[in-house]
Amino acid sequence: MSNGRILHTMLRVGDLDKSIKFYTEVMGMQLLRTNENKEYEYTLAFVGYGDESQGAVIELTYNWGKTEYDLGTAFGHIAIGVDDIYATCDAIKAAGGNVTREAGPVKGGTTHIAFVKDPDGYMIELIQNKQASAGLEG
C-alpha cells in the first residue's frame, strides 16, 4: 500500500455552522463541499487549504440533533504547518479563536509549535512550516 495517501480526517461536530465558520474564518480554510443525507439525518462539510486532489482535508460530520460529543482520551490532535506561527496565533486570537498554548519552542527542542482548540474541543497543533516536514526535532 505504498501508493496510498491520507484523504481526510473526520470530526463529529455539534454545530455545523459554528464549525464551518471556525475552520474558514479563524483557521483560513475553504469550504470545499457539503453533502446532506436526509434519510440518515446527517450533513457532511469538507474544509481544507486546497483542492482535495492535492492534499488531506477535514470532514466535519453533523448528526442532526446531536449537539455534543465525549471526545475521550484516544484522539490527540490535528497538525497544520504554518509559515509564521507567531503571526498565525495573533490572527487566530483576533478572529476569536482559542489559542491554548502560545507559540514557542517545544519543551527540550527547537521546533516552534502552538495549540488551538476548535468549537467542539478538538486540538489543533500549529508547527512552523520550515520545521513541519522534519517533525518535532530537538
From Swiss-Prot:
Signal peptide: none annotated. It catalyses: (R)-S-lactoylglutathione = methylglyoxal + glutathione. Substrate binds at residues 12, 63, 77. Belongs to the glyoxalase I family. GO terms for biological process: methylglyoxal catabolic process to D-lactate via S-lactoyl-glutathione. Catalyzes the conversion of hemimercaptal, formed from methylglyoxal and glutathione, to S-lactoylglutathione. NCBIfam families: glyox_I. The active site is at 125 (proton donor/acceptor). The keyword Metal-binding applies. It comes from Vibrio parahaemolyticus serotype O3:K6 (strain RIMD 2210633). Residues 5-129 form the VOC domain. The gene is gloA. GO terms for cellular component: cytoplasm. InterPro entries: Glyas_Bleomycin-R_OHBP_Dase, Glyas_Fos-R_dOase_dom, Glyoxalase_1, Glyoxalase_1_CS, VOC. Its EC number is 4.4.1.5. GO terms for molecular function: lactoylglutathione lyase activity; metal ion binding. Pathway: Secondary metabolite metabolism; methylglyoxal degradation; (R)-lactate from methylglyoxal: step 1/2. It holds the Pfam family Glyoxalase. Its cofactor is Ni(2+). Keywords: Lyase, Metal-binding, Nickel. Ni(2+) binds at residues 8, 59, 77, 125. Binds 1 nickel ion per subunit. It comes from the Bacteria. It is an enzyme of class 4 (lyase). This is Probable lactoylglutathione lyase.
